[in-house]
Amino acid sequence: MKKLVMLLALVALTSLGATAGADNKTKVKWFGHAAFEIDLPSGKTILIDPWITNPTNPTGKDDVKTVKADLILITHGHFDHIGDATDIAKRTKAHLVATFDLGNAIVAGGYPKDQYGFDTGGNFGGSLDVLGGEATISFVPAIHSSAIGTDPAKAGYGGNPGGFVIVVKGGPTIYHTGDTDLFGDMALIGSHWKVDLMLSCIGDHFTMGPDRAAEAVKLVKAKQVVPMHFGTFPVLTGTPDEFGKALKKTAPSAKLTVMKVGDTITL
């Protein structure tokens, strides 16, 4: 009887350990366009470029009311990247992470001013330890533009466009390119960090298209890549199929993961 009790206890402990290990994962959800949610093992949540109500997301109007956020990261000032940030921030109390000038401009546009400051504002070359040390966020450049507002007569200064490298403690390293063209210094990102997941724009017209995005993956040496910023508008003509073909030629070792809007992957 004693042996049976010990055996059952061992099985229970093994089961609990397996469950804890399964939960100790980072999850990434795509809301369409450039909007991603990163769920950390602790339960904390990072949103990037949260245009949750973008036209590719059929549940956007509901999602924007329920999405969680502890931090909101914005790559640049265009409307399709600031998106629903202010409304989400007012509901969740999420702090804003952005380059300093961009952050100030977003606050001037209505983002709660007590949810942004020197602790979450930075600039290229800088890194922030966030969420009690569970993650480090680094600011990296992008080649794009960053005006705030679509009316040329009223467009405001939005700082410089950029991307983010997010290193989860004991977990994956994720690079969100923001909107950008291919540029040579992407190789420095690949040499400084071991990028597990690259979230890469591929839509062409306003950013690099599939061929140049594949070159970017090669420079970054990303293990896995998820295409984004395509198909939202007719002019964003780059497709995941074209990107996949280019990857096979240019960066064949990279794993291509094509997400559907609303999909979640576990790292």
Task: Describe the residue ranges of each PLM region.
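Glycine/small-residue-rich loop that forms an oxyanion/phosphate-binding "nest" at active or ligand-binding sites
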Residues: 83-86, 97-100, 106-111, 115-126, ...
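Pre-active-site segment of Zn-dependent metallo-hydrolases
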Residues: 41-79, 83-90, 98, 104, ...
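Zn-dependent metallo-beta-lactamase
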Residues: 2-45, 52-54, 138-143, 261-263
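Active-site environment of divalent metal-dependent phosphoester hydrolases
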Residues: 54-55, 79-83, 103-106, 124-128, ...
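Active-site-proximal loop/helix segments of hydrolase catalytic cores
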Residues: 146-219
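Binuclear metal-ion centers of metallo-dependent hydrolases, dominated by the metallo-beta-lactamase
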Residues: 107-131, 214, 218-267
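Active-site neighborhood of phospho(di)ester-bond hydrolases with catalytic His/Asp-centered motifs
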Residues: 48-49, 69-77, 97-100, 174-178, ...
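Beta-strand-turn-beta hairpins that frame and shape the catalytic cleft
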Residues: 22-26, 40-46, 127-138, 167-174, ...
